[in-house]
Curated annotation (Swiss-Prot):
Homology family: Belongs to the UPF0725 (EMB2204) family.
Organism listed in the record: Arabidopsis thaliana
Protein name per the record: Putative UPF0725 protein At1g28500
Region (Disordered): 301-326
Lineage per the UniProt record: Eukaryota, Viridiplantae, Streptophyta, Embryophyta, Tracheophyta
Biased composition (Basic and acidic residues): 301-320
Length: 326
């Protein structure tokens, strides 16, 4: 429908066309809506065919969103699917977007070898790693009843997994050396061979780097640097004394990564690939199956700034108490 036709809509007709469009999109939970035409300009989903050979936006990020969806599926189902290829994806027109990705993946020894997956990722903030995988599922074929979400379809969900304790609210500071040495039930430092065999650790770090540098000349457009991971510590619940494989797949965890190879980062003033940088990433998977990732680069200056803020707040509070006494 042309722009001129759209301008001839009455308010009631406009609302009706929009409702009909989103009703059609909702039938496939946003994944197979490319044949449904948006009735008006700037309404609807963008559609991209990853097999056409044409360029599409943020290919590095979209691929890692697909990998993150498979990661969630593997944790919850105890499988080991690996990404073969992206087929297509739809995305909302927001700056912070929701992505509906269709992909092919395989599991060694599985029959058939390739299976089609659907992954939905909702970004909560731009230029920050704050996102939720709301759907990660096998796509049903035409002879099977389609699996749908229980909630009403909302194009951009902006929801996160529910948590409590140390795994909710702002991300923590970097743990002290004393805590790392003595609180072994809570913190576990991975051996090099262990984190090298754990693909999702590098995936989380790559997502943080890409999410925080999405400008025209950022790494999301120019390419990921060759970072080198030096140290990985995983924090799980204090009473958690499970074996390593269970700890790595814990539904709630903080991952502390020390690395080099990033020329610059948004939060740190030091420039150079030689600089040791630190990243903190939280993973929460709740009972509904939502997987939320929240991450940041960390500097000791963050702690200093918070300390100064607390001192300032305490001075104000003390001054107010003295005023009331007078």
């Amino acid at each position: 429908m042309s722009t001129e036709d759209a301008l001839c809509f009455t308010g009631e007709e406009y609302a009706r066309h929009v409702r009909e469009y989103w009703r059609g999109v909702a039938e496939s939970d946003g994944f197979d809506s490319e044949d449904i035409r948006s009735p008006v300009v700037l309404t609807g989903l963008f559609h991209y065919d990853c097999q056409s050979g044409r360029r599409y936006p943020d290919p590095l990020l979209v691929k890692r969103y697909a990998l993150l969806g498979l990661h969630r599926f593997n944790i919850l189902q105890g499988t080991s699917f690996e990404l073969d290829a992206l087929q297509k994806f739809n995305k909302t027109m927001n700056l912070t977007s929701s992505y509906y990705i269709t992909l092919l993946a395989n599991e060694p020894g599985a029959i058939p070898l390739q299976k089609t997956f659907q992954v939905r990722v909702d970004e909560r903030k731009y230029d920050t790693l704050d996102l939720t995988v709301a759907i990660a599922r096998l796509k049903k074929d035409q002879n099977e009843a389609a699996e749908t979400t229980k909630e009403p379809f909302v194009p951009h969900f902006c929801c996160s997994a529910v948590s409590d304790g140390v795994f909710q609210g702002p991300l923590p500071d970097w743990p002290s050396d004393d805590a790392l040495r003595h609180d072994r039930n809570r913190f576990y430092e991975l051996e090099k061979s262990e984190w090298q065999a754990t693909d999702w650790i590098s995936l989380y770090l790559e997502l943080l780097i890409l999410a925080t540098d999405r400008g025209m000349f950022g790494v999301a457009q120019t390419g990921l640097p060759q970072v080198q991971i030096l140290k990985v510590v995983i924090e799980t619940e204090e009473e958690n004394e499970k074996p390593l494989d269970k700890r790595l797949n814990a539904r709630r965890a903080h991952v502390y990564i020390t690395f080099t190879g990033l020329p610059k980062s948004p939060r740190l003033v030091e420039i150079g690939e030689h600089v040791e940088r630190k990243a903190i990433i939280r993973r929460v998977i709740d009972d509904s199956g939502y997987l939320t990732l929240l991450g940041k680069f960390w500097s000791g200056k963050d702690t200093e700034q918070r300390s100064k803020t607390r001192q300032s707040e305490e001075k104000v509070e003390s001054s107010q108490k003295r005023s009331r006494l007078c």
